[in-house]
Amino acid sequence: MFHYHYIKVIADSENMSTKEITSILQKYFAKQNDGFYLEIDLDDHAADFDGSGKWLKRLEGNILWLDGEYVALSGVQQNNPDDSFIVKISTIRYIIVHNKE
């Protein structure tokens, strides 16, 4: 079971380019077993993790280049840990770092 502890917002698409956001995601994905994971706010809301009214998805895995756009693997963890899908990085509004406790 995950306990959600807010750390910080590390990317904001209103103030950052897709290239900058991709660079941040690649940096975090490169760290293995560091106790952190990422959640993102998307335009196509999928799961409300923290009850705050912010609709979030959890990002995990690698950055991929697919059909001319950067994408990342995402999994909705609250209801079905195995429910994975591709997220377009261009749809990300902001990225939050959480700590697994």
Regions found by a protein language model. Name each.
Residues 69-74:
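Short aromatic-glycine-enriched beta-strand elements
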Residues 1-58, 77-101:
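Short glycine-rich, low-complexity segments
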